[in-house]
Amino acid sequence: MDEDAYAACRRFPTQAKPIIELSARDEGFRDLCADFATAEAELQKWRGSQHILREQRVSEYVVLVEALAGEIVSTLENASVVPFPRR
């Protein structure tokens, strides 16, 4: 599993299998996971910063991380396969 998908798995451990499977076959989802991993890393960096803009950046990254997490959930829900009923 790549590091970006692992970030999504850490956030949604009960969805690890679908995350890994979708990441393996969907480039857009891999990109979404990469954006999520980057945003989480930046959030942690800013939380540890002493910069004057720290609070502003932390607030911005919290919003971004939550939005990307919501997109991950939505993508996973939309990717669920519903089997056809047997005839």
Q: What is each of the regions a protein language model found here?
A:
Residues 1-87:
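Extended, charge-rich alpha-helical interface modules
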